[in-house]
Each structure stands twice: as C-alpha cells, then as structure tokens.
A protein has these predicted regions:
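Glycan-processing catalytic domains of CAZymes
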Residues: 1-276
Length: 276
C-alpha cells in the first residue's frame, strides 16, 4: 500500500539562502523578519517528509565535490529518495554537476535523479529564442548522467505561466516536470493551467510544487490559497495525475510563517491517505 507521505518532497536549499527576501514582516514600521537557519535535512524532519530535491544556489553552493556537498548527502542518509540539481537557482551551472551526481549515486543508494531549476530561462528571459542552446545543454547533461550507478531521470522546474514558451523538442528531452505557480494570486488558475499542461505533456511524470511564501509579495501565501493548493494537490495525487507534491522550502521555515504551521498539520493529517 502506498501512502501520500511516500510521495511528499521538500525543495531543499542551503540555510540562509533566501534571507534577503524575508524582509516584509510588519511593513510600515514593524519589526524585520529574521533569516532562516533551517537546513534541508532539518526542514524535512520538521515537516516529516521522506524525499528531497536538493538545489544549489545561484552562487553554486553547495559546490559539487566539496566537503559541504558531501555532508549534505550524509545528512540525507535517512531519506528515501534524493534528487540533486544539475542546474541551480537562477539557472546556475558549474559544469561538473553531472559528474558529482554520478559520484554520489555510487555512494548513496537514495540518489534517484537530476533536477534542473530555472533551466528554461538560463539563456535569457525568452526561452523560445534559445531552443538550440537548451537542447544542446540537456543532451550534454543526459549523456554525462549515463555514468551513474542507475538511471537518473531528469526533472525540471516548469512555471505554470511560462509553459507555452517552451519548445516541444526541449520538453521531450526531460522525464519529469515540477509545476510551480510563481505568483500566489494566480493559484485560482491552477486547475485550468494544470489540465492544459497535462494535454501538452501527456507522457511526462508530473509533480506539483507548493510554496509557503510568495517571493513576489514578500509575504506568506494567503491562508485560503495555501489550503486550496494543498487540497488540490492531494486531489491530483489521489487521482494519479501527479506522482508527488514538493514543498518549498527550508529557507523560509522556522521564522513563524502561518503557512508553515498549517503545512505541518496538513501533512500529519494526510500522510496515511492511500494513493496510487
């Protein structure tokens, strides 16, 4: 029997990565929100989720093959499944990510895939104008991942508002999509947009990303919208339309967001729901 908790993931980044974006608490003279020191492993422990997508920052940290990177892997030993980023925040790449993923796949049995964050805009804000570069990059990534201990499927961040700008030839080279609604005010459009994504990408594996914090407004996601996206995600999961839910992120945890408190309780309440 498969339970919902088996398909819950944390979107992990280094502690303090988003501190400069956590500055909106009490606008208009109120106190500043302090940064988050919560690590990815701590975030997974706090939420009680067993799977991790570890994404490097736009400064490349944790840098592949460093002590920091290996220590993150050590902290993930209790987790069931871990994807590591081939492409980090803002589309950052060092170029040795695939070699590192192959290396850790031989050392840690839970390494299960490569993740491309912000990949579609890494060559510019209009991905439809950079199809050749995107194709060449993905082909290179996939070729290098062939040295891994087992097949490493490639998943990519897909923002709901930008799906129409991605060439089909590019989409066809990735195995899975993690769908995100960047501006929380657009969450009411999620059912319609997700159906369109299903029709456009019927063969891809799909996960739904869920934000606790809106980086465009510098505020916690509205509670009603938070409840909506969680419940809709569970509905998709029970229907077999997605294979997982991804919660973003440890870097906004431990600072008192009401959405984090809600999410912890919601995960505890739904963890034993049977899913396909």
């Amino acid at each position: 029997m498969v339970k919902a908790i088996d398909k819950y993931w944390l979107f992990g980044v280094r502690a303090h990565q988003d501190d400069t974006l956590l500055d909106a608490l009490g606008r208009g003279g109120g106190k500043r929100r302090c940064g988050s020191r919560i690590t990815p492993a701590e975030g997974a422990f706090m939420l009680g989720v067993p799977n991790m997508i570890m994404v490097t920052g736009d400064n490349a940290e944790p840098v592949p093959f460093t002590h920091d990177a290996y220590q993150y892997c050590e902290s993930f030993r209790p987790l069931k499944r871990v994807m590591w980023s081939s492409c980090g925040s803002s589309g950052w790449r060092n170029g040795n990510e695939e070699a590192f993923i192959c290396d850790i796949s031989h050392k840690y049995d839970n390494i299960c895939g490569a993740y491309l964050d912000d990949f579609f805009t890494r060559f510019g804000s209009k991905p439809q104008e950079h199809t050749d570069e995107l194709l060449a990059c993905i082909q290179d990534i996939r070729a290098k991942l062939s040295a891994a201990a087992r097949p490493m499927p490639v998943y990519v961040t897909a923002y709901m508002h930008g799906m129409k700008d991605i060439a089909k030839s590019v989409m066809d080279l990735v195995d899975g999509l993690v769908f995100w609604t960047w501006q929380s005010k657009e969450l009411p459009l999620l059912p319609e947009r997700f159906q369109q994504a299903e029709e456009a990408c019927p063969k891809h594996k799909k996960l739904l990303g869920i934000y606790m914090y809106d980086f465009t407004t510098r505020e916690a996601v509205d509670m009603e919208l938070m409840k909506f996206q969680c419940e809709y995600g569970l509905e998709l999961l029970k229907a077999g339309r997605v294979e997982g839910l991804v919660f973003e992120a440890n870097s906004v945890m431990g600072i008192g967001l009401p959405t984090e408190e809600y999410l912890r309780e919601w995960i505890a309440q739904t963890r034993d729901v049977e899913v396909p």
